[in-house]
């Protein structure tokens, strides 16, 4: 059979490049982020020229297509190339690196300056919708997809949902970064005002999370891209704990895509399904998508592929993003920390009744080890890599567990109705949770 080595021999910032780094933080490989961050730094230099010449704005911006010479302007097809929040999406890795490592020096010297300049661009780029008062991006696209409107199939609109998600993430990351560093109060205040004027995530008449600001018909319900579900993963603007109605609407998006005739089942979209279902605490569905990826979308050498016939591909295309995004999804099945607390095996399938892991990482700066048997936790350990309060969700009856800190039993732990308890740990402290 024929295989192609690449889709178009460019770096794509509409999901593919980002997927290659979703695994790094949770898998304790944070040092592997360094090349990406150097790339973002170089990209921002070219992106300042694009911001000025294309949009007349300060700061920096980059779009979907990139190459080794730092191409940052809108390029290629309009239905995926005119995507200014691509820079925000790839820049979000800077903030996530800090969340997992708590590396304040990195945040001060590299992460926050890049995020701030990107946020500066969007503060000037956003326009107020005269009808709703919301701040809007645009014209922009929900990459590669399009909608039907008054008999037309269109790709460009104002504030597609993915843009709203990404601008919110950027502004929120900058606000939190500046608070951590104790700087830029006026800039923080500007971002807080702007973030309040962003439109909400909305549920359409079909019960799905809307992909566009207006409740329009999806022209390609079988499309491989579902960029608006960034809100579910890798971000957490939609979660079962905090936004249950939106979580149900996100699940409907996923279920409808998978059941659509001729769904475009490719390596990156199938790998995304693992993480989406893990976040929705649907273990069997997550495992099914992992199984499909391994049976259908991977070669004997373990390279993941985008199958021939999809997206105009003349033959199977090897793309690395599936190789990275799938294990990131597996990690999400085993450990989550995006809802404000640590949860062990939140999406454990029946096929994995016994197992263990060591050294997976959580937001807030910690490493977790876990052993389970007969689909039940036997022992969990959390080692702090920074001084802070951690929150842990206990599985089942709190009376079934013995808690130890550095080998000493902890008593009188305050556990809330959701079985979550807080604990203060110093760097290298070790919390143990054992089944009695």
Residues covered by each model-derived region:
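Single conserved hydrophobic/aromatic residue that forms the stacking wall/gate
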Residues: 1-7, 11
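Sequence context surrounding c-type heme c attachment/ligation sites in exported
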Residues: 58-69
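Short glycine/proline-rich turn/loop motifs
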Residues: 67-77
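Acidic/histidine-rich catalytic neighborhood
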Residues: 117-177
